[in-house]
Amino acid sequence: MIRVGLLGGSFNPAHGGHRRISLFAREALGLDEVWWLVSPGNPLKPKAGMAPLAARLASARKTARRAPIRVTAIERELGTKYTIDTLRGLTRRYPKCRFVWLMGSDNLAQFHRWKEWRNIARAMPIAVIARPGYDGAAIASPAMAWLARYRRSAASLIIRKTGSNRAEWSAPALIQLRFDPDPRSATQLRRADPDWALGFAGPAPRDGLTHRSIRPNPA
């Protein structure tokens, strides 16, 4: 079984902070690799200021270069809009992978607004990575009130071998990861360079999972 961490987001644009938390989580949780799920559109984020998917995927591929990170826009192919539907599609398509959902504490603070958020937690372990300025809201969130009973240490997220040599992680499980805060954010980068996407206007990037080209402004 391949152990995979899933980090979803707009990546508008991707930056070193994404890479750093991914590599940290990979080491802390004993993952084989991390997949960045570049969202075609986040239902909880405004469309204004959102760069084209092809540009965001290209920026993510550049940021993830030479790291055990796969960059994908597979949600577009799956036709999914919400995380729970994406996760169901991934588990069906990749039965030899065992997934853990990675997210920052800013997302935990609003996790209760996500579609079927409890079923997301039941589908796979969730690892929450501290993010400056959001820990208080995350701790006080409705989702944390429910997830707290499932809190586990990173060391407990281990592979259990069964007679069929399959690896299974139990869920729900909440793992809280702490490391030196990374102050970088996509919002700051957009403010500093509103036209950053123009730097990724070259050939259509290839999806790291499907290996198909991601064309600008797909129909």
Question: Predicted regions span which residues?
Answer:
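Nucleotidyltransferase catalytic core that binds NTPs
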Residues: 1-219
